Amino acid sequence: MTVRTIAPHRHAIADVHDIICYYRELAGTAVAENFAIEIDEACARLRQHPNIGFPRPALELDIEGIKSWALKRFPHQIFYEIQNDHVELWRILHPRRDITQATLSRQRFQ
């Protein structure tokens, strides 16, 4: 088994920050901390098993190679791409968001 490193894009980092702030304000510190723990656990799992996510059809997003994986206890999905030696985290988004090519476009991450 190849263990890969996690390489979060700045948008993924901002997503996590925004979600933690939202949960802290809405439901309290304990819920926000539980979200942070779940993100850490999800990243650890993706490091060891990067293929656990589901491919997002190219017709849907017009971007090849993007996978998504839903968190267990929170209604968010991690969007990522497997590289040779690492997993690129693109975004962490609520499924009610309009997840389009513009949301995940590679040009946004350049």
Residue ranges and their predicted role:
Residues 18, 22, 45, 49-52:
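Amphipathic, soluble alpha-helical interaction motifs
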Residues 40-42:
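Compact soluble domain cores
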